[in-house]
UniProtKB/Swiss-Prot annotation:
Bias type Basic and acidic residues, positions: 33-50
Name of the featured protein: Ribosomal RNA large subunit methyltransferase F
Keyword Iron recorded: no
Residues in the signal sequence: none
One cellular component (GO) term of this entry: cytoplasm
């Protein structure tokens, strides 16, 4: 299995480990570089890899694709949407929102023990393999090769959980994490609450909080004396509803062309998500800038801040902002699912020594 490309960035850490050890299995611990000192933005000598293998995280349950017979057995309603492809394999029409939602429900039931999952029309329907990849990589980030790290003691904050609640669901079921999930949309949180109530395995493990200020990220959510080992976020991608609609149309067109047909009707936005899930003023770049600025206020309450970054051009401004905040360590993890590349940007105000002490105090077995 090839390793994911992990690039060090202008930060206090010269190199990053490609993969941290899974606390539940034996693995070779990565070498840790000594911090170069807070506040520095020395360019790394690491060279980016020329090629990123088209593979999911080694612990990803979807590494070898979808087992449709098993999924249909677990969730019979999926059978209606499964068709053979021209190449002889089984698949669903990924341009059909109902087909994608039904596939997600089957995946969550078969692989993660979630018996009931649903989202309202218009809500973002997340690709499960890519979402759980993020969860696995930040689990590695948290462990840093420490085999004594008790993952089920970790407290995690999900910023912008949406109506699907996918990161809390996956984090709870894969690693036993305790979650706080926030959103600016009360209707989205109500749907996540309904999912929790219908699945006893999630009850008592996910706390929902409404963000009263749509311009804030952590403020109003993280409470005094509260600690989190990780924060996760999938920021709104677009800067306007018009841009979001165009992105949805383009995505559906590409899917239809891949299937050898053309779009005969306007694509439904429920393929892409609700307004707050899709766009915000200033788009992804502005959202990340706000997140980075606010993270300094909670530097001693969160061990690792992380976020997905979809647009590569947004990385440089993030690095520059982090370099001005006395951040100790910055890491960028590149993930690839098929032809799509996404990145996890992670930063910590704690030194490697302090992170080790944090794990010993809060995550010891």
């Amino acid at each position: 299995m090839s390793k994911p490309a992990v690039k060090s960035v202008p930060s206090a850490t010269a190199k990053t480990a490609t993969r941290a050890a899974n606390p539940r299995q034996k693995a070779k611990a990565p070498k840790q570089a000594k911090p170069e000192g807070k506040g520095r933005a020395k360019p790394s000598k690491d060279k980016p890899r020329a090629e990123i293998k088209k593979a999911l995280h080694p612990r990803n349950a979807h590494l070898n694709g979808y087992d449709f017979p098993a999924l249909i057995s677990a969730f019979p309603r999926l059978k209606t949407f499964v068709r053979p492809t021209p190449y002889g394999a089984l698949s669903v029409n990924f341009a059909d929102p109902l087909a994608v939602k039904t596939l997600n429900a089957a995946l969550l039931k078969h692989h993660y023990g979630i018996g009931s999952w649903n989202i309202p029309e218009g809500a973002l329907c997340p690709p499960i393999p890519g979402r759980v990849d993020y969860v696995h990589y930040v689990a590695d980030l948290l462990a840093e090769g420490d085999k004594s790290c008790a993952m089920d003691k970790a407290r995690v904050l999900d910023i912008g959980t949406g109506a699907n609640g996918i990161y809390p669901i996956l984090g709870c079921q894969v690693y036993g994490w305790q979650y706080v999930a926030s959103d600016i949309n009360a209707h989205s949180l109500a749907n996540v609450q309904s999912i929790i109530e219908q699945n006893p395995v999630l009850q008592g493990r996910i706390s929902l909080r409404l963000q009263p200020d749509d311009k804030a990220v952590f403020k109003g959510i993280i409470q005094a004396e509260e600690r989190f080992e990780l924060t996760l976020c999938n920021p709104p991608f677009h800067a306007s509803m018009a841009e979001a609609s165009e992105g949805t149309k383009r995505k559906v067109n590409n899917l239809q062309l891949n299937r050898g047909s053309s779009v005969k009707a306007a694509p439904k936005l429920n393929f892409g998500g609700q307004a707050a899930e899709l766009w915000c003023q200033g788009g992804e770049g502005q959202f990340l800038a706000t997140m980075i600025r606010e993270s300094q206020m909670f530097a001693d309450q969160c061990l690792w801040f992380t976020s997905l970054v979809s647009k590569q051009e947004n990385l440089k401004p993030c690095y520059q902002a982090l370099a001005q905040l006395n951040v100790d360590t910055v890491k960028t993890i590149e993930m690839q699912q098929g032809n799509k590349i996404t990145r996890v940007l992670a930063w910590s105000f704690q030194s490697a020594a302090k992170r080790k002490l944090w794990r010993a105090e809060h995550l010891a077995r």
